[in-house]
Amino acid sequence: MKKLTFLLVIVAASAFILAFRTLPAENKYGTNVGDKAIELAFSTPDGKTLALSSLKGKVVLIDFWASWCGPCRMENPNVVSAYKKYKDEKFKNGKGFTVFGVSLDRDKDAWMKAIERDGLEWTSHVSDLGGWQSRPAAIYGVNSIPTNWLIDGNGIIVGRNLRGPALDAALDQIIEKK
């Protein structure tokens, strides 16, 4: 009898575990395509806190970069071009496109000058001025820049590391066709 009870407990526990393992990962936060984007809330150049979630409803490119990063600065014209082209577009899951720029700078003046020189005209710029030890980089597991995540209006990651024409192509795929 004890063996039968033990066996039933094992079977029931296994069924319970399997049932929950196969449930869809709805609202799972992470950094992979299909995950809900992890919240970021850090200081803007004027010292206010800006949360990624404040942009909900828009398609957002979370763009990790720095003023001292040559490849980042070379990519900035592509990001600016995409911003200008898509900022007022309607998407399947979002209205408008913007950039949430996350700087890995340590020097605020260098960060501000790069924003101005590169014409990064969107208003969502954040940094904790922690460089490679910055909290946003740790949260997203950033170990090289430039790197980015594209999220839809519901905060779901729909693309990653989209540079050059790949960003336009990804935005074209999720734009609402007229």
Residue ranges of each PLM-predicted region?
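Intrinsically disordered, low-complexity Ser/Thr- and acidic-rich flexible linkers and loops
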Residues: E89-K95
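Alpha/beta-hydrolase fold active-site loops
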Residues: V59-V60, F97, P146
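Conserved redox-active cysteine motifs that mediate thiol-disulfide chemistry
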Residues: K56-G57, F64-K85
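N-terminal "domain-start" segment that seeds a small globular fold
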Residues: T22-S53, E176-K177
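Thiol-/selenol-based redox modules, centered on thioredoxin-like
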Residues: S144-K178
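Short, internal strand/loop/helix patches
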Residues: S43, F100, D105-D107, M112-W149, ...
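Bacterial Sec-dependent N-terminal signal peptides
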Residues: M1-K28, K178
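Extracytoplasmic/secreted envelope proteins and their assembly/folding machinery
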Residues: N76, V80-Y83, K108, M112, ...
